[in-house]
């Protein structure tokens, strides 16, 4: 084994020199340069500095503007709540532990940080799935005369929380466990060991299949069908410039959505799966740290993609920030009006709002 396993931790360094210590009790500066811990703390501070205002503003703007309180925007609010979970439950903790160079909050703190970071990430992930399904059903109309209402939105919210809890809660009750990972300043699922009594193998397989592969396939299917529907509608109205413009905008937005999804989750999932299938192999602490924080940065990607690209929401947000007046209102109004005749495939119809 090219690491040191202890009670509730796994340090990716062989303890031949006798310097490896518990990440709950001692600084881990023997793993990487102390400057790396300072850089990690600064990065987490940046995520807090950006992630909290934009997600809080999302909640505030929706509450302030009645026209935004639509059933579909409930899912967008769910994304903001999930991101705030990650900010307060994960980012603040990691910033604090990075300043000390080890997981100073102990085993209980590791469970709390791991749970809230996982819960927030999974709520966000399944919210994206619900958005994808809603867009597919509404735009592609596999079910005739379907209208996404408040009851559907509430069921969607309940579904995201149920699936998120089904992933985040089991490690708290003995099916797998949360342990410090990477530079030992944040906690995640134990992909590293086959510790007796925790059934890590079955949980990791369950998590990858049910909480990564299936959501990924659903998102690709729904947005793939969505693009096909947009192309078919545009082909039927080739003389319409506004339709062609709408097609391009929708295509761009969907591509950004899928790329962001992959950037956030594929590096972390890929590295975690490699570690799981190559337990005992040699790897450094940074190997898991970098992809883990790509996944955490989804708290910034989500509001930028799903809200800032939404014209109505952006208008309301600017109005709120500018004390009730939008200096770009005339320009945005003209842009919106130019798409009226292509309403069946316009970006406002296909974007998540």
From Swiss-Prot:
- Cytoplasmic-side stretches of the chain, per the record, are 62-73, 134-152, 225-252, 309-353
Q: Give the principal location in a single coarse category.
A: membrane
Q: Which GO terms describe its cellular component?
A: membrane; photoreceptor disc membrane; plasma membrane
* Modification N6-(retinylidene)lysine, positions: 296
Cellular location(s): Membrane; Cell projection, Cilium, Photoreceptor outer segment
How is the protein altered post-translationally, as described in the entry?
Answer: Phosphorylated on some or all of the serine and threonine residues present in the C-terminal region.
The job of this chain, per UniProt, is described as:
Photoreceptor required for image-forming vision at low light intensity. While most salt water fish species use retinal as chromophore, most freshwater fish use 3-dehydroretinal, or a mixture of retinal and 3-dehydroretinal. Light-induced isomerization of 11-cis to all-trans retinal triggers a conformational change that activates signaling via G-proteins. Subsequent receptor phosphorylation mediates displacement of the bound G-protein alpha subunit by arrestin and terminates signaling.
The protein here is known as Rhodopsin
């Amino acid at each position: 084994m090219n690491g040191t396993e202890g009670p509730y931790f796994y340090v990716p360094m062989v303890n031949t020199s006798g310097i490896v210590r518990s990440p709950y009790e001692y600084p881990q500066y023997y793993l990487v340069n102390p400057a790396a811990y300072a850089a990690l703390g600064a990065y987490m501070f940046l995520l807090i500095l950006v992630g909290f205002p934009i997600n809080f503003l999302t909640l505030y703007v929706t509450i302030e503007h009645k026209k935004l309180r639509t059933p579909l925007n409930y899912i967008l609010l769910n994304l903001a709540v999930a991101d705030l979970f990650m900010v307060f439950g994960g980012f603040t903790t990691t910033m604090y532990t990075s300043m000390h160079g080890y997981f100073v909050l102990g085993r209980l703190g590791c469970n709390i940080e791991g749970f809230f970071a996982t819960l927030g990430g999974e709520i966000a992930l399944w919210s994206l799935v619900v958005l994808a399904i809603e867009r597919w059903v509404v735009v592609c109309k596999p079910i005739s005369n379907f209208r996404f209402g408040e009851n559907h939105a509430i069921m969607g919210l309940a579904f995201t929380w149920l699936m998120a809890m089904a992933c985040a809660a089991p490690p708290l009750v003995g099916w797998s466990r949360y342990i410090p990972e990477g530079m030992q300043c944040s906690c995640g699922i134990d992909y590293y060991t086959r510790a007796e009594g925790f059934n890590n193998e079955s949980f990791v397989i369950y998590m990858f299949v049910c909480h990564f592969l299936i959501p990924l396939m659903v998102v690709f299917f729904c947005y793939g069908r969505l693009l096909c529907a947009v192309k078919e509608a545009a082909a039927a109205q080739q003389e319409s410039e506004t339709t062609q413009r709408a097609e391009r905008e929708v295509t761009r937005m969907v591509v950004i959505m899928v790329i962001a999804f992959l950037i956030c989750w594929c590096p972390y999932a890929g590295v975690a799966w490699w570690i799981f299938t190559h337990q005992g192999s040699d790897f450094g602490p940074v190997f898991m740290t970098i992809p883990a924080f790509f996944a955490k940065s989804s708290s910034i990607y989500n509001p930028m993609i799903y809200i800032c690209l939404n014209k109505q929401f952006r208008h309301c947000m600017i109005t709120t920030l500018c004390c009730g007046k939008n200096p770009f209102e005339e320009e945005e109004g003209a842009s919106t009006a130019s798409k009226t005749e292509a309403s069946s495939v316009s970006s406002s119809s296909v974007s998540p709002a």
